[in-house]
Every structure is written in C-alpha cells, then in structure tokens.
C-alpha cells in the first residue's frame, strides 16, 4: 500500500485475489521403499550436506514430512531424507500426499526450497 494509505489499482487487485486451493490429501506413515524418486529431480546433495542431515536426523529425528504426489507416487520434496531412511532401514516415514498433475509436479520441483 502506498505511504498515503490510499489503495491504488494494484493494491486493490491484490486484495481481490482468489483463495489458494488446498492440494493436500492426507498425512500418513509410509514404507519408504514404496516411494519413487522423481525422475526430473535436479537437486544433488553434496556429502557434507548429507552428513549434516544424517546427524540432525540421529539427534533430533523427523520434524518435516516428505511430500509425495498421490497420482504418480513421485517424491516432490524429501529425496535426501528418503535416501537416509532407506540406508538406516526405517520401516516408515512421515508423508504428506498431495493431488497434482504431472505438469504441476514439475513446477513444484522447480520452486520448492532445496
């Protein structure tokens, strides 16, 4: 909003935005062996990052769910956490299942924080 406190055309439009859709279907514990790494995942994790995450997982545990597309079974966020869970023999991992098209999946891969 401008300093004068008056709404301009651009701020008035911003207030009339459409409500965001909730694409989350459910949260559940899932066998990590059933989850599929996304074939278009471009993020590579260096050894120090993997070691740091492993140390945090050992000391703290799970604090964030992995995100998986219900339609394809592809992991959208949490590839490294799943890799570590498989290496450590975890039988379940916390997962948020979402409902996205394959095009939306690719957009999520490009925009989620690494």
Predicted regions and their residues:
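Short, charged/polar connector segments at secondary-structure boundaries
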Residues: 2-100, 104-114
């Amino acid at each position: 909003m401008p300093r004068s406190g008056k709404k301009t055309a651009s701020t008035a439009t911003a207030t009339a935005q459409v409500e965001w859709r909730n694409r989350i279907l459910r949260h559940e514990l899932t066998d990590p062996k059933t989850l599929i790494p996304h074939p278009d995942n471009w993020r590579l994790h260096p050894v120090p990052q993997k070691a740091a995450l492993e140390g945090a997982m050992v000391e703290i545990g799970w604090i964030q769910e992995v995100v998986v597309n219900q339609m394809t079974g592809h992991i959208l966020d949490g590839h490294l956490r799943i890799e570590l869970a498989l290496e450590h023999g975890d039988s379940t991992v916390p997962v948020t299942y979402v409902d996205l098209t394959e095009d939306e999946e690719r957009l999520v891969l490009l925009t989620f924080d690494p």
